[in-house]
């Protein structure tokens, strides 16, 4: 199974690693730097690639890497959080990562639930029925968050100002009348 580095080692604490000769990535497939300019272009490019995989029906669990010791990131700067209900051990952690019960961050800790379920849950609806999924979040952060975005099938479906979320922890509902995916991201 493929596991994708969504928070990859190009993302450093105060800057994004890039090749000054090309204005793009230091390695890997280059992005269109005119459409996705430095400094946030790499993050948007990484997300676009990930969204294309999800839109193709691939269930690619998110992961992260900091390249500590190679780049100036502290250990664990880009990190993956894995939801483990059962015994916490190496085998269970890897099993849950592979199942997609994870999220990545290099900032806030997002404890999101969809209809009370953690990340990675697969919802099923009867044929021809619309599925309405309530979303909630507990967010712990030392960073200033401007807004929270709900991304559905690669497009921003909702933007919630952080101040609005603080009132009750609700992110509203997301609806599906066909197969798809969604994610929650905090914008710092």
Regions from the PLM with identified roles:
Residues 10, 35-41, 46-188:
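C-terminal functional module detector
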Residues 1-40:
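Active-site gating loops and adjacent loop-to-helix segments of metal-dependent hydrolytic enzymes
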């Amino acid at each position: 199974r493929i596991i994708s580095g969504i928070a990859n080692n190009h993302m450093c604490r105060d800057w994004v690693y890039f090749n000054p000769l090309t204005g793009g990535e230091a390695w890997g497939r280059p992005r269109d730097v005119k459409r996705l300019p430095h400094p946030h272009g790499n993050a948007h490019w990484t997300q676009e690639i990930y969204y294309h995989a999800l839109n193709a029906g691939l269930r690619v669990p998110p992961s992260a890497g900091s390249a500590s010791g190679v780049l100036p990131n502290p250990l664990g700067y880009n990190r993956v959080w894995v939801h483990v209900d059962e015994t916490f051990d190496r085998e269970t952690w890897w099993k849950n990562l592979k199942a997609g019960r994870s999220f990545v961050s290099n900032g806030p800790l997002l404890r999101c639930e969809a209809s009370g379920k953690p990340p990675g849950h697969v919802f099923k609806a009867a044929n021809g029925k619309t599925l309405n999924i309530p979303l909630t979040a507990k967010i712990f952060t030392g960073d200033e968050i401007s807004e929270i975005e709900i991304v559905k099938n690669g497009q921003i479906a909702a933007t919630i100002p952080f101040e609005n979320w603080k009132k009750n922890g609700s992110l509203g509902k997301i609806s599906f009348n066909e197969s798809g995916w969604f994610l929650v991201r905090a914008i710092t």
